[in-house]
């Protein structure tokens, strides 16, 4: 049980720190825009590897390029995280595209369209 709590806290902390780096423009890459959001972080059982699922809250934003840029900057991101957290080793990050936000925006548009046609 302790490992699950530790894993959950670590996942939350990593997500928050990556989000802070993106919003504060700590990563100086023009492909990484402030509309990016960390959807979730999943650690491996041994806490050595972490998948970071990234989404965009802006429709039409190029998520593929942003994920490539984040993977290129993962060494820098890991070094920034290790400055803020006290663990023996920082996990190896892998940034992955997550389309769930854009799909939910699409479903919302459909529902809004149905509501407006129903009102007319």
From Swiss-Prot:
- Family statement: Belongs to the RbfA family.
Q: Which Pfam families match?
A: RBFA (PF02033)
Instruction: Write down any Gene Ontology CC term.
Output: cytosol
Q: How does it assemble?
A: Monomer. Binds 30S ribosomal subunits, but not 50S ribosomal subunits or 70S ribosomes.
Q: Report which superkingdom the organism of origin falls in.
A: Bacteria
The alphabetical list of record keywords is: Cytoplasm, Ribosome biogenesis
UniProt-annotated location(s): Cytoplasm
Q: Which GO terms describe its molecular function?
A: ribosomal small subunit binding
| Record function comment | One of several proteins that assist in the late maturation steps of the functional core of the 30S ribosomal subunit. Associates with free 30S ribosomal subunits (but not with 30S subunits that are part of 70S ribosomes or polysomes). Required for efficient processing of 16S rRNA. May interact with the 5'-terminal helix region of 16S rRNA.
What Gene3D superfamilies does the record tag this protein with? 3.30.300.20
PANTHER family reported for this sequence: RIBOSOME-BINDING FACTOR A, CHLOROPLASTIC-RELATED
Entry keyword Transmembrane helix? no
Q: Tell me the protein's name.
A: Ribosome-binding factor A
The question of whether Cytoplasm is a record keyword is answered with: yes
Offer one example of a GO biological process linked to this entry. Answer: maturation of SSU-rRNA
Q: Which InterPro entries match?
A: KH_dom-like_a/b (IPR015946), RbfA (IPR000238), RbfA_dom_sf (IPR023799), Ribosome-bd_factorA_CS (IPR020053)
